[in-house]
């Protein structure tokens, strides 16, 4: 298998080229991928594909759709959390959230994470490896198979930093957006980053209409550096400049994620400072009650303080929402289930 290629890493054009190089008709490429997107991962089960082609496919490709290690469904059935295992034994998490407007999946782009944000369980233990775009796609396909429902929205907010896995993240976006793929509109895809400034500027040149979400979590450098190592590399000023560049290039509104930690970044003065920082920007602030992590000592802000923080931003003309908690009874916050599983089971490869 080590010399074989994950078929999910091939675009339609890639597979067409392979068919031609192997003396087969290029239309067979679409037929094969149609089966894959219908959830058929066994080449021999692709009924309209001749045996001679399925034999060649089996000799050259494998389909890396992860297996389900654990599956948790919240009491209200609005959230389904998966622990997926890849062929090399590595574990990642994906979460499906069901809304009235459709089903959203939160995908992981790396096994673990090296960014070191102190309120995130994904980064405990560091990074193991990045996922290929086909492996990220496999999360969506497997989730659809398990839930029996179509995924209509994607958020790249699971474990890992998407911009630290730049090429695979972009290839994944283009594959799920393709008409011959899942045909999910770019405006239904959100990429979240801790703020790698050069990559934000690079992303601005890609001619994409996705939503960019920035994990900001502080109105100034002093506070941000206490929780996010990336803040020692790029200042808040540099980050905001890159965001304005992105907005001007794409004409797309940016979302700023702000996890509220009691007595760290949740006071009125912090809200006022944040309002000043974001004044005039085409942006939206998503306030997040911080999740409890076993290994960390952070405490979420009180409901009253969160509402007060939100009101200050709203009165300053900043579009603001408070994230609805989903799946808290199944530890659906990023990285928590994987961390617990890895801790209690055999070492990852």
Swiss-Prot record:
<dbReference type="GO" id="GO:0019843">
    <property type="term" value="F:rRNA binding"/>
</dbReference>
<dbReference type="GO" id="GO:0002935">
    <property type="term" value="F:tRNA (adenine(37)-C2)-methyltransferase activity"/>
</dbReference>
<keyword id="KW-0489">Methyltransferase</keyword>
<keyword id="KW-0411">Iron-sulfur</keyword>
<dbReference type="InterPro" id="IPR013785">
    <property type="entry name" value="Aldolase_TIM"/>
</dbReference>
<dbReference type="InterPro" id="IPR007197">
    <property type="entry name" value="rSAM"/>
</dbReference>
<dbReference type="GO" id="GO:0070040">
    <property type="term" value="F:rRNA (adenine(2503)-C2-)-methyltransferase activity"/>
</dbReference>
<dbReference type="Pfam" id="PF04055">
    <property type="entry name" value="Radical_SAM"/>
</dbReference>
<dbReference type="GO" id="GO:0030488">
    <property type="term" value="P:tRNA methylation"/>
</dbReference>
<keyword id="KW-0004">4Fe-4S</keyword>
<dbReference type="GO" id="GO:0051539">
    <property type="term" value="F:4 iron, 4 sulfur cluster binding"/>
</dbReference>
<keyword id="KW-0963">Cytoplasm</keyword>
<keyword id="KW-0479">Metal-binding</keyword>
<protein>
    <recommendedName>
        <fullName>Probable dual-specificity RNA methyltransferase RlmN</fullName>
        <ecNumber>2.1.1.192</ecNumber>
    </recommendedName>
</protein>
<keyword id="KW-0698">rRNA processing</keyword>
<dbReference type="GO" id="GO:0070475">
    <property type="term" value="P:rRNA base methylation"/>
</dbReference>
<keyword id="KW-0819">tRNA processing</keyword>
<feature type="binding site">
    <location>
        <begin position="215"/>
        <end position="217"/>
    </location>
    <ligand>
        <name>S-adenosyl-L-methionine</name>
    </ligand>
</feature>
<keyword id="KW-1015">Disulfide bond</keyword>
<keyword id="KW-0949">S-adenosyl-L-methionine</keyword>
<dbReference type="InterPro" id="IPR048641">
    <property type="entry name" value="RlmN_N"/>
</dbReference>
<dbReference type="GO" id="GO:0005737">
    <property type="term" value="C:cytoplasm"/>
</dbReference>
<dbReference type="InterPro" id="IPR004383">
    <property type="entry name" value="rRNA_lsu_MTrfase_RlmN/Cfr"/>
</dbReference>
<dbReference type="Pfam" id="PF21016">
    <property type="entry name" value="RlmN_N"/>
</dbReference>
<comment type="function">
    <text>Specifically methylates position 2 of adenine 2503 in 23S rRNA and position 2 of adenine 37 in tRNAs.</text>
</comment>
<feature type="domain" description="Radical SAM core">
    <location>
        <begin position="99"/>
        <end position="329"/>
    </location>
</feature>
<dbReference type="InterPro" id="IPR027492">
    <property type="entry name" value="RNA_MTrfase_RlmN"/>
</dbReference>
<comment type="similarity">
    <text>Belongs to the radical SAM superfamily. RlmN family.</text>
</comment>
<feature type="binding site">
    <location>
        <position position="113"/>
    </location>
    <ligand>
        <name>[4Fe-4S] cluster</name>
    </ligand>
</feature>
<keyword id="KW-0408">Iron</keyword>
<feature type="binding site">
    <location>
        <position position="291"/>
    </location>
    <ligand>
        <name>S-adenosyl-L-methionine</name>
    </ligand>
</feature>
<feature type="disulfide bond" description="(transient)">
    <location>
        <begin position="106"/>
        <end position="334"/>
    </location>
</feature>
<feature type="active site" description="Proton acceptor">
    <location>
        <position position="93"/>
    </location>
</feature>
<feature type="binding site">
    <location>
        <position position="192"/>
    </location>
    <ligand>
        <name>S-adenosyl-L-methionine</name>
    </ligand>
</feature>
<feature type="binding site">
    <location>
        <position position="120"/>
    </location>
    <ligand>
        <name>[4Fe-4S] cluster</name>
    </ligand>
</feature>
<keyword id="KW-0808">Transferase</keyword>
<dbReference type="GO" id="GO:0000049">
    <property type="term" value="F:tRNA binding"/>
</dbReference>
<feature type="active site" description="S-methylcysteine intermediate">
    <location>
        <position position="334"/>
    </location>
</feature>
<dbReference type="InterPro" id="IPR040072">
    <property type="entry name" value="Methyltransferase_A"/>
</dbReference>
<feature type="binding site">
    <location>
        <begin position="160"/>
        <end position="161"/>
    </location>
    <ligand>
        <name>S-adenosyl-L-methionine</name>
    </ligand>
</feature>
<dbReference type="GO" id="GO:0046872">
    <property type="term" value="F:metal ion binding"/>
</dbReference>
<feature type="binding site">
    <location>
        <position position="117"/>
    </location>
    <ligand>
        <name>[4Fe-4S] cluster</name>
    </ligand>
</feature>
């Amino acid at each position: 298998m080590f010399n074989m290629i994950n078929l999910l890493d091939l675009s339609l054009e890639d597979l067409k080229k392979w068919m031609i190089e192997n003396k087969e008709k290029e239309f067979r490429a679409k037929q094969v991928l149609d089966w894959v997107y219908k959830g058929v991962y066994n080449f021999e089960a692709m009924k309209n594909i001749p045996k001679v082609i399925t034999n060649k496919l089996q000799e050259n490709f494998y389909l890396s759709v992860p297996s389900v290690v654990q599956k948790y469904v919240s009491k209200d059935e609005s959230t389904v959390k998966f622990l997926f295992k890849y062929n090399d034994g590595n574990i990642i998490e994906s979460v499906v959230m069901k809304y009235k407007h459709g089903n959203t999946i939160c995908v992981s782009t790396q096994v673990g994470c090296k960014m070191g944000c102190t309120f995130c369980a994904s980064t405990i233990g560091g990074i193991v490896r990045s996922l290929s775009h086909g492996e990220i796609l496999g999360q969506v396909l497997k989730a659809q198979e398990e839930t029996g429902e179509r995924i209509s929205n994607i958020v790249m907010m699971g474990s890992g930093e998407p911009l630290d896995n730049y090429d695979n993240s972009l290839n994944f976006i283009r594959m799920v957006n393709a008409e011959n793929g899942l045909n999910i509109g770019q405006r239904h895809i959100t990429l979240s980053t801790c703020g790698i400034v050069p990559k934000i500027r690079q992303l601005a040149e890609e001619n994409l209409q996705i939503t960019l979400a920035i994990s900001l979590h502080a109105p100034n450098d002093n506070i941000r550096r206490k929780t996010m190592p990336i803040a020692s590399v790029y200042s808040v000023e540099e980050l905001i400049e890159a965001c304005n560049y992105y907005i001007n290039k794409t004409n797309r509104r940016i979302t700023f994620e702000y996890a509220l930690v009691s007595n760290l970044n949740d006071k009125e003065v912090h809200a006022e400072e944040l309002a000043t920082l974001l004044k005039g920007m085409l942006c939206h602030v998503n306030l997040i009650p911080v999740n409890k992590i076993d290994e960390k000592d952070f405490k979420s802000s009180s409901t009253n303080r969160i509402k007060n923080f939100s009101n200050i931003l709203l009165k300053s003309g900043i579009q603001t929402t408070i994230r609805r908690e989903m799946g808290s009874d199944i530890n659906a916050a990023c990285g928590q289930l994987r961390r617990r599983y890895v801790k209690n089971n055999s070492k990852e490869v």
